[in-house]
């Protein structure tokens, strides 16, 4: 009898050791009774289905017995690639039972994610476009290849997009709404602004790319981490069915406290071939404290000012991969016209747009895009911040060609119809054809210079082996780099 009792205790100990655990979220703002559950690698579809049925059964029993949580249970399911999991509202007894299941890797309290942008002054010229095709600040022309991101889809994981804004020329579409507020519009303005920087005909970098609105933040610019993960999952599934994940970009101008689940979801999308640009954050602190910016496989973007100095608000540190214009950036606003905003939220869409541009031009995808942007960029940013390992400012390659404008430029696109009369800008004379410098490739044909400085009125105003990645050296080096020699 004693032998059998010993075996039973031993098996129970093994089961407990193999079960999941509930992660602590530190100082992040948690959402009461809301949790994200991530299943272990190797969980089959059948096991996952049985687990969900079991969860619903015990949850119904517990809430009926205790009379809790009217709007409860599983709300989001994640099933793309290696990442299996779900999120929902559960009482304490249910979430303890879930975390004790050996099939569960971990349970994470749901937290609030917010935008990384803030409204600034109105009617200032947007300098970001010109800067990313020039050797030095102060130029006024944006020179780019006429392919302009054609064939690439950019997913705006944000507050939504005004898809009817004329600057999108019919290339914007509504994808999904994870907020479930019944308001399939951008009631904040943040998402429309970032989308304009990515693909708008006037303020955009990839002027022929498409943009899909994926609403994960409410009209106040905040939303649950579980909804962000659901948004990434939706993007990956949609891209795989519409042109391929290797022709897709996700921009995430948002962030919150460190989240293992959110970082895993972002890494899974990159592993499938998508390019993810993520805002570093606006707290003037180490970006490793924020998700999804702390995920090693995404392209984390800090903000620069017009004088090429790191913007005072921009996060810094080893997690930052690149810098891009982020102070006083003018772009589209809901309802028409434009507005100026500042933040790493404005820097990230510059990288997303340029990523789409390079993907169309060179046929690369996934993490290779961020590496390519590092090669094309210029070492221009001053005061990049403590522990930051780069001072690279993004560039579309024009500066690598000696700052010379390619020959035979085509006409720039016409700006959006302003709400007040404006004087038209003078057309730019094309430069003479130039021979490439020794060792440099010939310039790409049919570039287009643009005058991005026309002011517009304003009416006021983050798997090769998915699980291995999480436990691998690179992930921990990035997350806890301050402790490494």
UniProtKB/Swiss-Prot annotation:
Chain spans, region Disordered: 377-462
Domain Peptidase S8: 126-400
InterPro entries registered for this protein in UniProt: PCSK9_ProteinaseK-like, Peptidase_S8/S53_dom, Peptidase_S8/S53_dom_sf, Peptidase_S8_Ser-AS, Peptidase_S8_subtilisin-like, Peptidase_S8_subtilisin-rel, S8pro/Inhibitor_I9, S8pro/Inhibitor_I9_sf
Propeptide: 20-116
Signal peptide from the UniProt entry: 1-19
Listed PROSITE patterns: SUBTILASE, SUBTILASE_SER
Domain of life: Eukaryota
Gene Ontology terms, MF aspect: serine-type endopeptidase activity
Enzyme category, top tier: hydrolase
Pfam families cross-referenced by the UniProt entry: Inhibitor_I9 (PF05922), Peptidase_S8 (PF00082)
Compositionally biased intervals (Pro residues): 409-418, 433-455
Biased composition (Polar residues): 377-394
GO process annotations (BP): proteolysis
EC number(s) given by UniProt: 3.4.21.-
Role noted for this protein: Secreted subtilisin-like serine protease with keratinolytic activity that contributes to pathogenicity.
List of catalytic residues: 158 (charge relay system), 190 (charge relay system), 345 (charge relay system)
Protein family according to the UniProt entry: Belongs to the peptidase S8 family.
Record protein name field: Subtilisin-like protease 1
Biased composition (Low complexity): 419-428
CDD domains linked to this entry: Peptidases_S8_PCSK9_ProteinaseK_like
